[in-house]
Regions:
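Hydrophobic alpha-helical transmembrane segments of multi-pass integral membrane proteins
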Residues: 66-70, 93-130, 306-314, 328, ...
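Short helix-coil transition sites and intra-membrane helix breaks within transmembrane domains
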Residues: 22-25, 60-63, 74-84, 111-123, ...
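Interfacial loop-to-transmembrane junctions
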Residues: 90, 94-95, 299, 408-430
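Alpha-helical transmembrane segments of multi-pass membrane proteins
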Residues: 97-110, 137-154, 180-185, 189, ...
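Hydrophobic core segments of alpha-helical transmembrane domains in multi-pass membrane transport
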Residues: 7-19, 30-39, 69-72, 106-111, ...
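Re-entrant/interfacial helical elements at transmembrane boundaries that shape
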Residues: 71, 85-87, 119-131, 160-172, ...
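Hydrophobic transmembrane alpha-helices of multi-pass solute/ion transporters
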Residues: 1-72, 85, 89, 93, ...
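Long, contiguous bundles of hydrophobic transmembrane helices that form the permeation core
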Residues: 2, 39-40, 182-294, 408, ...
């Protein structure tokens, strides 16, 4: 093992350990990046001011509008009582027994509708908070449910999902987003069912221990009296959600169909979120005094979330430029076994090393894709299987403690790694990892 590869492993382990212990990723990530750089013989200032800051800044440049608007949307829904009304209505409709499903299903629908998982975290959390309060469940169980719905099958396995993890393989294998539908459906079953069973087991475990919902001291929510709100107020929670999904998917199509304009996805999500915010505000005009404070709190809250994520991305940027990363890539690409198994291992390892599903998969496929496409010799079935295994594998080791989505989810929910990461790890890391490797061996 080269010293540089050892540095990557040491830096990664240190990053995960300190993040799990609750230390701020804002200083932990650059320190761990420096460890990687020093052991790789890389200039410290070049690594920090150059590669680290560039990776961090590029991420903020790309994602800040979505984080900002997503946080504002979530806070408007929260402080106006719309999220609470919708959450209470869902609990009344299906009962507190199915509180987990009431959180997981909306996450699945929104991510399958094309909404970024980062945005879903901001949008769903206020509603989930209300659902878990109404069901008297520990709020520390909520991140696991959100992660299961947002970071799982609709990100990688469901046929036709518009998430980037399902789009990247099409460039390498000439496939479509519907690739390997049967394999995809099997993957959905073996990933979602165990995850849901686990979450329900955690609920039963918490009830046996006598645990209850404990309000988050940092969660500022107007104490709306349910009797003071009209019985139809839950509509103010569901309509903005529908508007966001429809605008994200329908508006770009209409623009292209009738004006010949191709709207970029990052522009589309901004327009959709602005539409959702405006509709939420219009439906709650009777609470006009609440709206500006909600927008202000949402804007402030978005900064911490995106900085946590961007710092983790900066660490991955340093890892990718040191010599040891080439060694890691070589190990991943030369795994014994079938091409499907080799691909599954490679994508998982590189997604874990970079802390990014799309980043790890892009690196793996840029090296593996042409080679495997050639080995498939035009066999459509094999190419589609390669597509699906790559996509599913990207959602395995990516959700280690330093993953940006994990950090965002924990920051938004004000939970620590120690309190909630185990549920995220089991449902979005261990189960997808085992599933991807198992399916690759079939």
């Amino acid at each position: 093992m080269s010293l540089s590869l050892f540095g990557i492993i040491l830096g990664l382990v240190l990053l995960m350990f300190l993040a799990y212990k609750g230390y701020s990723i804002i200083w932990v990530a650059p320190v761990c990046a420096v460890v990687v750089a020093v052991l790789s013989g890389y200039a410290i200032l070049d690594a920090y001011i150059g590669d680290y800051m560039k990776g961090m800044a590029d991420y903020v440049l790309q994602w800040f509008p979505a984080f900002f608007l997503g946080a504002v949307y979530g806070k408007v829904m929260d402080l106006t009582g719309s999220a609470r009304s919708l959450g209470n209505a869902l609990v009344k409709l299906i009962g507190p027994r199915f509180a987990v499903a009431a959180v997981v299903i909306p996450c699945l629908l929104m991510t399958y509708g094309g909404i970024s998982l980062f945005v879903v975290v901001f949008v769903i959390y206020p509603m989930g908070y209300s659902i878990y309060r109404a069901a008297d469940l520990p709020r520390t169980l909520l991140p696991g449910a959100i992660a299961t719905g947002a970071f799982g099958i609709t990100m990688t396995a469901v046929p036709g999902t518009p998430q980037i993890q399902n789009l990247i393989p099409t460039d390498y294998y000439g496939t479509t987003t519907m690739a390997a539908p049967l394999l995809s459906l099997v993957a959905c079953a073996v990933m979602l069912l165990p995850a849901y069973i686990y979450l329900e087991w955690r609920v039963r475990q918490s009830r046996r221990k006598g645990l209850h919902f404990v309000p988050d001291p940092k969660h500022k929510e107007v104490d709306h009296d349910s009797k003071a709100l009209p019985s139809w107020h839950w509509v103010t929670g569901i309509v903005p959600l529908v508007v966001v999904v429809l605008m994200l998917n329908l508006f770009p199509w209409l623009l292209n169909r009738f004006a010949g304009i191709e709207l970029a996805s990052n522009y589309a999500i901004v327009i959709a979120l602005v539409g959702g915010i405006l509709v939420a505000c219009l439906l709650n005009l009777n609470q006009a005094k609440t709206l500006l404070p909600a927008i202000n709190e949402g804007a402030n809250g978005s900064m911490g979330a995106i900085m946590n994520t961007a710092c983790a991305v900066g660490f991955g940027s340093v890892v990718k430029v040191v010599p040891g990363f080439a060694s890691l890539t070589s190990i991943a690409l030369n795994m014994p076994g079938s091409i499907l198994f080799s691909e599954a291992v490679a994508v998982n390892l590189l997604a874990g090393a970079t802390g990014s599903a799309s980043g790890g998969m892009s690196i793996a496929l840029s090296a593996l894709g042409p080679k495997y496409a050639e080995m498939a010799a035009g066999n459509t079935g094999v190419l589609e299987a390669l597509h699906r295994i790559a996509s599913i594998s990207s959602g395995g080791l990516d959700t280690l403690p330093h993953n940006g989505a994990v950090l965002t989810l924990l920051a938004v929910s004000n939970c620590t790694h120690k309190e909630s990461y185990i549920d995220i790890c089991i449902t979005t890391c261990i189960i997808p990892l085992v599933s991807s490797l198992g399916l690759a061996l079939i």
